Structure formats: structure tokens, C-alpha cells
Amino acid sequence: LYMYTRGIGSCFIGNPIIKKKYQYRDKKRMMVVMAFGKPKGSCYRKQAEAKRLSLDDLCVYKETPRQWMKQLLDAARMAPSSMNSQPWRFVVFDSRIHIFSKKHPSDKLGKWDEVNFGIMFANMMTAAEEMWLDVDLIRLDELSQKNFQNNQYVLSAILRP
């Protein structure tokens, strides 16, 4: 997000494109690389061009969310994900966001969830900082013990405006 504010374009590149000789270093496997630089044209694109799901498709609201909550969710929504899978789902109640991962029919997409969620959380936390919101990311035992049919609980964001 910082590079974006400086007019620098970026793109995450997954493992299949990276040459095999560069995939491992010190017994660690490289998962993703970020390419970045000054674009020929604009590095900005319209939200519709990003082909992201709407907040209504991603969120369940227990009550009408405040404007700052929608802004925070929108930052999470716009995060890039592998193959544009957008695995995150949100249950919003008061000043809490319960974050879930959509279960994948294929393990090929699911293996990227840690990277995808890391990027999404970075977007969310950067937006929260810009809005002067305090956010605690916590794992609630009562939700982590439940079995959900189409989703898996990840974390909860507790916000203090």
C-alpha cells in the first residue's frame, strides 16, 4: 500500500513462474515474490477492474456497520489474492470482525491461504493505522472450536475507534 501511495506499481508472483533454482534458499521454500517499479501508465486502476467481490458478498452484518468499519472492510476486500480467490469472509458485529476462510474444493488454492491472509491482514492493519483505529487480532476459543460447513475460522479483529 505504501508503494501504491508513491506511484509505484506492484504485482505478487507465485511459485510456478519462479525458476526452480531460485525456489529454495537455506532449506526454505520461496512462496511468492513481489515485482514492483514505475509503470508506463498509471499504477492506479478502478475498483471494477480489480474484479473483487462486493462487501455484501463477503460480509454478514449483525447490525448496520459504521462508516469507518466499512472503510476498513473495503481495504481488506481490495487485497490481492492468489488466482483472485478472495478466500476471506467476514462476520461483523459492533466493533468486532470475525474473519473466516472459505473452504476450497481444491487443495491447490487452499495452500496459498496463509499468504493471502497475510496480505489481507497487512491491508487491514495499514488502513486501521491511517484511520487512527486500535486493532487487536485475537483467536477466540469459542469460535475456533466450532465446525462450520463452508468456512473455517481464522481470527477476530477487535477495534477501538
Q: Model regions: which residues?
A:
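Acidic, surface-exposed loops and disordered segments
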Residues: 1-161
